[in-house]
Amino acid sequence: MKIVLQKAIALSGFCSRRKAEVLIENNEIKINGQIAKKGDKVDLKKDKIEIRGKKLSSQPEAIYLMLNKPRGYTCTNRRFPNEKNIFDLLPNKERLFAVGRLDKDSRGLVLLTNNGDLAFKLSHPSFEHKKEYQVKLKEKVEKPKLISEKFIKGIDIGENDGIVKAVGAEYLQNNIFIITLSEGKKRQIRRMFNYFKLTILDLKRISLSGIFLGNLEEGKWRNLNKKEIEYLLNK
């Protein structure tokens, strides 16, 4: 079956659909020896697709998994000396895209897949997928209701990012909040609490796009089940 070229490339796990479109525009892709054009359709099993002179392998088996990221690990595909990386925790050495990256000081749920198209859809801010975090603060919270209301109304976090909002902000007890975002500026939650001069001791993502971390042990991973995969693919 023929499908649009950029979708075929994303399904192969080479890159996202958006990146594939850039490669097509730059004349870096050939189909059966001919320069590809936007809108071309291909059959991954029959057509020879070359990207920058290298043959694209046919669609691999789809991989969808979750990881409970520990604090101190980075989420990038680039490796740096003397730095721990989440891919060190995974047995699969195939190229995977991390969905919903967490900064080095945060922990919790990260989704990983070789489906570049899905990774783009779940990561791009325009799709506004919800992400839920459990936040433990160092200082005693005196006015939790005021903080929750301000989070939802909007806070100017500066650095040209302007006003950002939380979809949900619920105070539990013992200086713990549950914060829900549909956007993701750099270190957004930390900067929002810093507005109130509050310091985060622990930041843990507990759900992403309707997929929940549950009781998965820290530093461990598991494959998503059929129901979870279908839910993500149909979003």
Q: Can you describe what each PLM-predicted range is?
A:
Residues K2-K235:
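Basic, flexible Lys/Arg- and Gly-enriched helix-loop patches that mediate nucleic-acid binding at interfaces
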